[in-house]
């Protein structure tokens, strides 16, 4: 973490790991890499190679434009341990496929990330961005005996994901008011999303 002190404003560069480079993950990686050090993780070598060449592996006009034209502190990797080991925040945007017949979300990919983060960097704040069932965040906090998991729902459209992050209708981040560290982390993450947005006056809750 690096602090730049000016007369009035303190700029903080955070180290952020993003697990997953689908619409949610890559749009967030692009948004946050404008002002922070971001490492994106994926299991597909071709996607990692493309991101490292600043070529979008998904169709999204704004992601393509920002990767090509903006100065972004963004790298991609296949190595989860290296991605998570020094991160202040780990954003989990892993797939959670929904089975409508069984009314079931497959959260195994999310929990695989949680387990690896707890192994290599247990103090990191994990922010779940994946689609998950009601009550899931609280259940994994109890299951893994850690307070360092929060949830921030996404309101994104495919092919418009970065645009919707740049012009958010609202920013929502869960917290634990009984834990000052988590309360501060939630406010910090909401501020990072606002900082990357074109319009920073959006209400966050």
What is each residue range found by the language model?
Residues 10-204:
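Structural/interface elements that position substrates and couple domains in central-metabolism enzymes
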């Amino acid at each position: 973490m690096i602090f730049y002190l000016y007369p009035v404003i303190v700029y903080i560069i955070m180290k952020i790991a993003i697990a997953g480079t689908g619409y949610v993950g890559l749009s967030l990686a692009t948004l946050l890499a404008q002002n922070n050090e971001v490492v994106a993780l994926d299991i597909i070598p071709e996607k990692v190679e493309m991101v490292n060449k600043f070529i979008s592996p998904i169709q999204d006009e704004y992601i393509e434009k920002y990767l090509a034209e903006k100065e972004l502190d963004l790298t991609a990797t296949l190595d989860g341990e290296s991605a998570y080991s020094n991160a202040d925040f780990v954003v989990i945007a892993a797939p959670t496929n929904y089975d409508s017949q069984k009314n079931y979300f497959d959260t195994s990919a999310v929990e695989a990330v949680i387990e690896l983060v707890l192994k290599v960097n247990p103090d990191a704040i994990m922010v779940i961005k994946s689609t998950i069932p009601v009550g899931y965040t609280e259940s994994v906090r109890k299951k893994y005996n850690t307070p360092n998991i929060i949830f921030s729902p996404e309101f994104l459209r495919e092919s418009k994901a970065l645009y919707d992050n740049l012009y958010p209708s609202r920013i929502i981040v869960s917290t634990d008011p009984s834990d000052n560290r988590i309360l501060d982390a939630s406010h910090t993450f909401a501020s990072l999303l606002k900082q990357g947005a074109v319009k920073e006056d959006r209400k966050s809750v």
